[in-house]
Amino acid sequence: CIGNVGAYFTGIAHFIVTTHIAGCLPTVYDIPQAQVNSRCVFSNTLPTGPYRGAGRPEASYLIERVIDAAADQTGIDAAELRRRNLIAPDKIPYTTAFGNSYDSGDFPGAFERALALADYAGFAARKKAAKKQGRLRGIGIGCYLEIAGAFPEEAARITFPGGDKVLVSV
């Protein structure tokens, strides 16, 4: 996976990108084993920082494209292939192949609701009707799971520099 760190080095950009790629990669899918090899590249875009979502978009794009390619190669509907691989509610709490823990979530329930709201079952008919009118119609599916924080713990330091002073660094 290639992570875009932007136009110049900000000190921790490479760490943010690579950590989030691994943390986000399984998303909502039950993937028992995984390995990530990633590289960071400089580009003409904004520099990467903690608030730019670095690594998350790359990971989501990667896993969703792999699933779409597998669906194309096997002839299995893309929604069905995703459905078969979602983390079941009875597996929560769930630990990913990269050690992240999901403490809640009904991924199949949310997925089915999204498909119903999009009328995924009726898409083939809409596509056929659009083609008769000379229009092309497509549909895409993607699942996304946001991880909170890059580190498993937070840190603070309390020091007493002397006298009646206390210094708290967070």
Language-model features, listed with the residues they occupy:
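Cysteine-centered functional microenvironments
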Residues: 128
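N-terminal leader/propeptide and maturation segments of large enzyme subunits in energy/redox metabolism
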Residues: 46-122
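Gly/Pro-rich active-site capping loops and adjacent beta-alpha segments
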Residues: 1-59, 122, 131-170
